Swiss-Prot record:
Has hemolytic and antibacterial activities. Its main location: secreted. Expressed by the skin dorsal glands. Disulfide bonds: none annotated. The modification Leucine amide is found at L17. It is found in: Secreted. Keywords: Amidation, Amphibian defense peptide, Antibiotic, Antimicrobial, Cytolysis, Hemolysis, Secreted. This is Ocellatin-5. Belongs to the frog skin active peptide (FSAP) family. Ocellatin subfamily. One of its GO terms (cellular component) is extracellular region. One of its GO terms (biological process) is killing of cells of another organism.
Amino acid sequence: GLLDFLKAAGKGLVTNL
């Protein structure tokens, strides 16, 4: 779902930072 996508994107951003 959309929430899952946002969670995955958030994890990606945190990892990149």
